[in-house]
């Protein structure tokens, strides 16, 4: 089975998602790590729905801003992924698939209003 592309980040750009997001640094990297935003039991779901980004080593595992070392950055990435997922799917569907909410109540309300709009 072919895995879908990331809905957050274009791998062919050869940029690190966090270098761009945090520092507006668009330098290309020879080596990038694929990071699944929701790991553990949701790693397969992250892959299936394209919830992954490409990171340099410093932003993946080694530096102080590394997603595996920095809870604040990891949670912001999870919130961003949930918001993008819910642009294509419902909040209810996110909860059924991933089993946890990462957004605050205002953001959830905005997304559920979209679900109730007439087609």
Cite the ranges covered by each PLM segment.
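Cys/His-coordinated zinc-binding microdomains
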Residues: 20-23, 57-60
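Short recognition patches in nucleic-acid-associated and regulatory proteins
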Residues: 24-43
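Secondary-structure junction/capping motif
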Residues: 16, 33, 89-90
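Short, charged surface segments at domain edges that flank catalytic/cofactor-binding sites
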Residues: 1-21, 44-50
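Polybasic, low-complexity binding patches
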Residues: 43-53, 61-119
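A broad, low-specificity signal marking well-ordered, structured residues that form hydrophobic/aromatic
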Residues: 32, 53-54
């Amino acid at each position: 089975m072919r895995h879908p592309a990331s809905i957050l980040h274009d791998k062919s750009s050869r940029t690190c998602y966090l270098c761009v997001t945090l520092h507006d640094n668009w330098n290309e990297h020879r080596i990038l790590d694929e990071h699944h935003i929701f790991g553990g039991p949701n790693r397969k779901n992250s892959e299936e729905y394209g919830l992954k980004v490409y990171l340099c080593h410093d932003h993946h595992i080694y530096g102080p801003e590394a997603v595996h070392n920095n809870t604040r950055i990891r949670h912001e990435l999870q919130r961003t992924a949930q918001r993008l997922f819910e642009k294509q799917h419902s909040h209810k569907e996110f909860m059924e698939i991933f089993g946890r909410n990462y957004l605050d109540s205002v953001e959830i309300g905005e997304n559920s209003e979209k679900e109730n709009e007439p087609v």
